[in-house]
Amino acid sequence: NSLEKNPDLRDLRNETLVGVLDGKILVHNHCYRADEMATMINISDEFGYKVSTFHHGVEAYKIADLLADEGICAALWADWWGFKHEAYDMSIANIAIVDQARGGKGCAIVHSDDASGIQRLNQEAAKALAAGRKAGFDISEGRAMTWITKNPAKSLGILEQTGTLEEGKDADIVIWSGNPFSIYSKAEQVYIDGALAFDKASNFMPHTDFDLGVKEWEDK
């Protein structure tokens, strides 16, 4: 064993496992089905580590109370499912059900690993909000906003740094032309760490992908 011969040699695999067991590394699991997620929770309980978030979680609504009890977030699609066997049994109110579990103690996140969906994550949240209200849940727009702000920060373990508008946190802010959940609203300004990173009114910034292409062509 190389570690026995050289105890100063780092074992990156076990070092990572130690970080997980010590709670310094947050575990994110990719699961679709409820039984898969429940099994992973049982395994985490057996070996003494914490699952931070389940990703995709098409059947998360089936174990929403369990997720809330365990303090586990679920990063979910608003309305995408059925593309393979384990993704068939979806509820359009999945995000809302997870959010409202145990009297609103759930941690739901609107997720998208699609290039178009992530560009319009606010609209994905709007669809999830509409589905939840249609299902009978009384969910405010402010609550729905946490699905793409506060809860992702909590999931990543950086809530003390970002995720909400509070004094002392990173000033990562988007100024919208209207209601962020409206398809007609556009990002007017974007601030990152308090510095203006995008200004729609500025003539120095391209406004569309077409403008970007034209600029690249002109620079050649």
Label for each model-derived stretch:
Residues 154, 166-210:
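C-terminal cap of metal-dependent C-N hydrolases
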Residues 26, 65-68, 72-176, 196:
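His/Asp/Glu-enriched, well-ordered alpha-helical/loop segment
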Residues 1-53, 186, 192, 217-218:
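Polyanionic/metal-chelating signatures
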Residues 34-38, 57-64, 117-119:
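Active-site environment of divalent metal-dependent phosphoester hydrolases
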Residues 53-57, 75:
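Short internal beta-strands
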Residues 41-48, 58-61, 69:
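Acidic, glycine-rich loop-and-beta core segments that form the ion-binding/anion-interacting portion
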Residues 208-220:
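Surface-exposed acidic, glycine/proline-enriched linker/cap segments
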